[in-house]
Amino acid sequence: MQRLFALILAIFLWFHFAPPAQALGADLVPCSESPAFQQRAQVARNTTADPESGKKRFERYSQALCGPEGLPHLIVDGRLDHAGDFLIPSILFLYIAGWIGWVGRAYLQTIKKQGSNVEQKEIQIELPIALPIMLSGFAWPAAAIKEFLSGELTAKDEEITISPR
Protein backbone atom coordinates (compact mmCIF):
# COMPACT_ATOMS: atom_id res chain seq x y z
CA MET A 1 0.00 0.00 0.00
CA GLN A 2 2.83 2.37 0.84
CA ARG A 3 4.52 1.68 -2.48
CA LEU A 4 1.27 2.34 -4.34
CA PHE A 5 0.86 5.64 -2.52
CA ALA A 6 4.47 6.58 -3.33
CA LEU A 7 3.90 5.71 -7.00
CA ILE A 8 0.71 7.78 -7.20
CA LEU A 9 2.47 10.69 -5.50
CA ALA A 10 5.38 10.46 -7.93
CA ILE A 11 2.98 10.47 -10.91
CA PHE A 12 1.11 13.50 -9.59
CA LEU A 13 4.34 15.38 -9.05
CA TRP A 14 5.71 14.27 -12.43
CA PHE A 15 2.69 15.65 -14.28
CA HIS A 16 2.64 18.85 -12.19
CA PHE A 17 -0.66 18.31 -10.44
CA ALA A 18 0.80 20.12 -7.45
CA PRO A 19 -0.10 23.81 -7.33
CA PRO A 20 2.73 26.10 -8.40
CA ALA A 21 4.50 27.94 -5.61
CA GLN A 22 4.61 31.70 -5.90
CA ALA A 23 7.75 33.63 -5.18
CA LEU A 24 7.77 35.67 -1.98
CA GLY A 25 6.20 39.04 -2.61
CA ALA A 26 5.13 38.20 -6.16
CA ASP A 27 1.66 39.63 -5.56
CA LEU A 28 2.95 42.72 -3.71
CA VAL A 29 2.98 46.13 -5.35
CA PRO A 30 4.21 49.50 -4.06
CA CYS A 31 1.49 50.87 -1.79
CA SER A 32 1.45 54.13 -3.73
CA GLU A 33 0.18 52.12 -6.74
CA SER A 34 -2.39 50.01 -4.86
CA PRO A 35 -6.03 51.12 -5.35
CA ALA A 36 -7.10 49.46 -2.08
CA PHE A 37 -4.36 51.34 -0.21
CA GLN A 38 -5.44 54.63 -1.80
CA GLN A 39 -9.01 54.03 -0.58
CA ARG A 40 -7.72 53.38 2.93
CA ALA A 41 -5.58 56.53 2.78
CA GLN A 42 -8.60 58.69 1.96
CA VAL A 43 -10.38 57.68 5.17
CA ALA A 44 -7.27 57.67 7.39
CA ARG A 45 -7.98 58.64 10.98
CA ASN A 46 -5.66 60.85 12.96
CA THR A 47 -3.92 59.01 15.76
CA THR A 48 -2.41 62.00 17.56
CA ALA A 49 -3.37 65.60 18.22
CA ASP A 50 -1.80 66.54 14.89
CA PRO A 51 -4.66 66.93 12.36
CA GLU A 52 -2.36 65.66 9.59
CA SER A 53 -1.13 62.53 11.44
CA GLY A 54 -3.27 60.10 9.41
CA LYS A 55 -2.14 61.60 6.12
CA LYS A 56 1.52 61.59 7.20
CA ARG A 57 1.27 57.97 8.35
CA PHE A 58 -0.09 56.84 5.00
CA GLU A 59 2.59 58.86 3.16
CA ARG A 60 5.24 56.87 5.04
CA TYR A 61 3.43 53.59 4.36
CA SER A 62 3.20 54.40 0.64
CA GLN A 63 6.89 53.50 0.31
CA ALA A 64 6.22 49.94 1.52
CA LEU A 65 4.86 46.99 -0.47
CA CYS A 66 1.13 46.25 -0.25
CA GLY A 67 -0.89 43.14 -0.87
CA PRO A 68 -4.17 43.01 -2.80
CA GLU A 69 -6.07 44.04 0.36
CA GLY A 70 -4.17 47.34 0.53
CA LEU A 71 -2.23 46.61 3.72
CA PRO A 72 1.57 47.09 3.94
CA HIS A 73 3.63 43.91 4.27
CA LEU A 74 7.07 43.46 5.79
CA ILE A 75 9.63 41.54 3.78
CA VAL A 76 11.75 39.64 6.29
CA ASP A 77 13.78 37.35 4.07
CA GLY A 78 17.18 38.90 4.73
CA ARG A 79 17.52 40.88 1.51
CA LEU A 80 19.40 44.08 2.25
CA ASP A 81 17.11 46.28 0.14
CA HIS A 82 14.45 45.74 2.84
CA ALA A 83 16.86 46.05 5.80
CA GLY A 84 15.07 49.11 7.17
CA ASP A 85 11.78 47.23 7.37
CA PHE A 86 12.86 44.46 9.72
CA LEU A 87 16.59 43.76 9.93
CA ILE A 88 17.74 47.03 11.51
CA PRO A 89 14.89 47.22 14.08
CA SER A 90 15.41 43.57 15.06
CA ILE A 91 19.15 44.05 15.59
CA LEU A 92 18.43 47.18 17.64
CA PHE A 93 15.88 45.23 19.71
CA LEU A 94 18.38 42.44 20.40
CA TYR A 95 21.06 44.99 21.38
CA ILE A 96 18.73 46.77 23.82
CA ALA A 97 17.44 43.48 25.27
CA GLY A 98 21.02 42.30 25.70
CA TRP A 99 21.93 45.58 27.39
CA ILE A 100 19.07 45.20 29.86
CA GLY A 101 19.95 41.57 30.59
CA TRP A 102 23.67 42.26 30.95
CA VAL A 103 23.10 45.20 33.30
CA GLY A 104 20.62 43.19 35.38
CA ARG A 105 23.09 40.33 35.65
CA ALA A 106 25.91 42.67 36.65
CA TYR A 107 23.71 44.36 39.27
CA LEU A 108 22.73 41.01 40.81
CA GLN A 109 26.36 39.90 40.92
CA THR A 110 27.40 43.18 42.56
CA ILE A 111 24.78 43.09 45.31
CA LYS A 112 25.51 39.40 45.93
CA LYS A 113 29.18 40.27 46.56
CA GLN A 114 28.12 42.89 49.12
CA GLY A 115 26.28 40.13 50.95
CA SER A 116 23.83 42.04 53.13
CA ASN A 117 20.10 42.13 52.44
CA VAL A 118 20.41 40.81 48.88
CA GLU A 119 16.72 39.96 48.42
CA GLN A 120 15.62 43.46 49.44
CA LYS A 121 18.14 45.03 47.03
CA GLU A 122 16.66 42.94 44.22
CA ILE A 123 13.23 44.43 44.92
CA GLN A 124 14.29 47.98 45.72
CA ILE A 125 17.10 48.84 43.33
CA GLU A 126 19.86 50.95 44.84
CA LEU A 127 20.59 53.71 42.33
CA PRO A 128 24.15 54.49 43.51
CA ILE A 129 25.04 50.90 42.64
CA ALA A 130 22.83 50.53 39.55
CA LEU A 131 23.58 53.78 37.66
CA PRO A 132 27.30 53.16 37.00
CA ILE A 133 26.46 49.62 35.92
CA MET A 134 23.71 50.90 33.59
CA LEU A 135 26.02 53.47 32.00
CA SER A 136 28.72 50.87 31.36
CA GLY A 137 26.21 48.45 29.83
CA PHE A 138 26.43 49.92 26.30
CA ALA A 139 29.57 47.85 25.70
CA TRP A 140 27.91 44.60 26.70
CA PRO A 141 28.79 42.67 23.48
CA ALA A 142 32.52 43.24 24.04
CA ALA A 143 32.22 42.43 27.75
CA ALA A 144 30.29 39.24 26.95
CA ILE A 145 32.95 38.08 24.50
CA LYS A 146 35.70 38.86 27.03
CA GLU A 147 33.92 36.93 29.79
CA PHE A 148 33.15 34.02 27.47
CA LEU A 149 36.76 33.68 26.37
CA SER A 150 38.02 33.90 29.96
CA GLY A 151 35.50 31.28 31.13
CA GLU A 152 33.85 33.66 33.59
CA LEU A 153 30.54 33.73 31.66
CA THR A 154 29.86 30.00 31.75
CA ALA A 155 29.53 27.76 34.79
CA LYS A 156 32.09 25.06 35.49
CA ASP A 157 30.97 21.43 35.31
CA GLU A 158 31.43 21.00 39.07
CA GLU A 159 28.96 23.84 39.75
CA ILE A 160 26.14 22.21 37.79
CA THR A 161 23.97 19.93 39.88
CA ILE A 162 22.83 16.61 38.47
CA SER A 163 19.42 15.21 39.30
CA PRO A 164 19.69 11.84 41.12
CA ARG A 165 17.12 10.06 38.95
Curated annotation (Swiss-Prot):
Keywords carried by this UniProt record: Membrane, Photosynthesis, Photosystem I, Signal, Thylakoid, Transmembrane, Transmembrane helix
Top-level taxonomic group: Bacteria
GO CC, alphabetical: photosystem I reaction center; plasma membrane-derived thylakoid membrane
Topology of the protein relative to the lipid bilayer: Single-pass membrane protein
One of the protein's GO biological processes: photosynthesis
Signal peptide: 1-23
Segments traversing the membrane: 83-103
Subcellular localization, as worded in the UniProt entry: Cellular thylakoid membrane
Pfam family, one: PSI_PsaF
Family recorded in the similarity comment: Belongs to the PsaF family.
Function recorded in the entry: Probably participates in efficiency of electron transfer from plastocyanin to P700 (or cytochrome c553 in algae and cyanobacteria). This plastocyanin-docking protein contributes to the specific association of plastocyanin to PSI.
Stated name of the protein: Photosystem I reaction center subunit III
Species, as recorded: Mastigocladus laminosus
Name of the gene: psaF
